[in-house]
C-alpha cells in the first residue's frame, strides 16, 4: 500500500506541471470566446487555408510549423488565455504542445477545428 502511494505521489509530481490545455467542442469554444473577448485567438493553419476556407473574426495566423520562430508575435504574458484552432483539430494539438513548451499555461483548443466550427454554422471571415 505504501509503495502505491509513493508511486502515485511521484507520478503526480513528475507529470503535473500546472499547464492548462483544454480541448473543447464548438459550443464551449464559442462560449469561452464570448466570456474572454480579449483573449488571443490563434489560427495555426496555412496562409492558403486561411484565404480559401476563411477564419474566425479577430484571429491571428501563425502556421503551426512557424510558432517557435514567430514566438515574438504571441502574447508576452505566458498566462494569457489563448484560443487555438486549425482545420480539423490535428495540427492544433501539435501547436498546443509547442505553446506549452514555450511556457504558455492557459490554452483552449477547438478539437474539431474550423471544419467543425463551419459545420455548426458558426460565422467565418474571408480576407479581401
Residue spans of the language-model regions?
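Rhodanese-like catalytic fold shared by cysteine-dependent sulfurtransferases
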Residues: 1-32, 38-40, 47-81, 87-128
Amino acid at each position: 500500500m505504501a509503495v502505491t502511494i509513493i508511486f502515485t505521489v511521484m507520478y503526480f509530481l513528475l507529470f503535473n506541471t500546472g499547464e492548462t490545455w483544454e480541448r473543447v467542442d464548438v459550443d464551449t469554444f464559442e462560449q469561452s470566446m464570448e466570456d474572454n473577448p480579449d483573449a488571443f485567438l490563434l489560427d495555426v493553419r496555412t496562409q492558403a487555408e486561411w484565404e480559401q476556407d476563411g477564419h474566425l473574426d479577430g484571429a491571428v495566423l501563425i502556421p503551426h510549423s512557424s510558432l517557435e520562430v514567430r514566438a515574438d508575435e504571441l502574447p508576452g504574458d505566458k498566462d494569457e488565455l489563448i484560443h487555438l484552432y486549425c482545420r480539423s483539430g490535428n495540427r492544433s494539438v501539435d501547436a498546443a504542445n509547442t505553446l506549452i513548451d514555450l511556457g504558455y499555461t492557459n490554452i483552449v483548443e477547438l478539437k474539431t477545428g474550423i471544419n467543425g466550427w463551419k459545420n455548426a454554422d458558426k460565422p467565418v471571415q474571408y480576407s479581401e
